[in-house]
């Protein structure tokens, strides 16, 4: 997260956009304190984005720099501030169907307002390059049960949309 002068500059930018553009503002600044969230909210930011990435069980296989609980605590602070929470994850990172289900349930339990679902696009030279692209039916099944478990959330298709046809 930004701190000090950088955070103050971000606050100024959000205040300016809120005042002059009259648009909904969403911040995505990583781990953040309750005080910083409050300042963002006062500056006109109404939503905060912070993906949980995957299930609690699969998280250590994907990320070693921080914990799943740190992600959850950040999202709880967002909700406590009265802001809209935007959080989702990436499918196709070697997780099981149960992991996807657990991620959908975790997001429902947190009352997440907007859920971006990203489908991994394996890129040569990256740690997950060996994984196969997801099939269109797998992506659609995942979206379907995310919708069922999170009926009020805005489900957003993000990375991997190119894997879907127009059929």
Say what each PLM segment does.
Residues 69-127, 138-158:
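Conserved C-terminal portion of the radical SAM core fold
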Residues 32-42, 92-108, 162-167:
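Catalytic cores of alpha/beta
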Residues 1-78, 83-88, 113-118:
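Core AdoMet radical
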Residues 2-5, 65, 91-96, 123, ...:
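Short, small-residue-enriched loops and turns at beta-alpha junctions
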Residues 8-9, 31-32, 69, 98, ...:
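Residue-level recognition of alpha-helix initiation/capping sites
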Residues 24-28, 154-159:
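Short catalytic-loop micro-motif centered on adjacent basic/acidic residues
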Residues 54, 121, 161:
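Flexible, active-site-proximal loop/turn residues at the rims of small-molecule/cofactor binding pockets
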Residues 27-32, 128-134:
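Short, exposed beta-strand "edge-strand" segments with a Pro/Gly-rich flavor and a Y/T-containing core
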């Amino acid at each position: 997260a930004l701190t000090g002068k950088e955070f103050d500059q971000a606050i100024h930018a959000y205040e300016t956009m809120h005042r002059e553009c009259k648009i909904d503002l969403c911040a995505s600044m990583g781990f953040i304190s309750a005080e910083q969230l409050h300042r963002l909210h006062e500056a006109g930011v109404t939503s905060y984005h912070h993906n949980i990435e995957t299930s609690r069980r699969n998280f250590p296989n994907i990320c070693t720099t921080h914990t799943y609980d740190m992600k959850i605590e950040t999202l709880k602070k967002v909700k406590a501030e009265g802001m809209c929470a935007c959080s989702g994850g990436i499918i196709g990172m070697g997780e099981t169907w149960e992991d996807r289900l657990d991620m959908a349930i975790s997001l429902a339990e947190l009352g997440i307002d907007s859920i971006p679902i990203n489908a991994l696009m394996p890129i040569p030279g990256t740690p997950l390059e060996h994984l196969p692209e997801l099939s269109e039916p797998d992506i659609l099944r995942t979206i379907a049960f995310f919708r069922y478990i999170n009926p009020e959330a805005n489900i957003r298709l993000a990375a991997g949309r190119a894997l879907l046809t127009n059929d």
